[in-house]
């Protein structure tokens, strides 16, 4: 499947990226370019690549680079596993409704689509409310049956926390630990600090300040 291929190749692509950005000879070639002789786009391009190399870890010792390569491959694998688990959890978390009365408030087209989806999934005569890739489900605003709304909300909210093969909690915990390890290897106190350094906000504190004004 595409998901299996994604999991197989994600760490390979991560390793390929590291071979570029953690390449000492390539980084030194960039550093030897005299920025004072450049102008405009040429100067900005040099700054851009130099910054990208340094953010990726080009200044690390050889030993720390090797540690970072291992972490990056593990993160690539975990990130792909998380996405695949979430995709399967969304598919399997669909809500099956027996009685059309429970769909009061939905349009005729929405009800017809739910019936067709149920038939395709092997539930002829019933109705399937597929989960969307958001926490809040669009159908909630129109459904009038409180019990149906509650079931749909819980199906969405708990889709990846059922203790089955698609439960994402352990994957997220591992990813969080590795992100912290990566940030610390790169001289930052948190992954957010590392991730934001070349963004407009620059720091987690600045992001929080922006959110507080919304």
Where are these regions (language model features)?
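His/Asp/Glu-rich acidic catalytic environments and adjacent acidic regulatory segments
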Residues: 2-197, 201-202
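Conserved glycine-bearing catalytic or ligand-binding loops at nucleotide- and phosphate-handling centers
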Residues: 73, 206-213
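Substrate-binding cleft of carbohydrate-active enzyme catalytic domains
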Residues: 171, 213-214
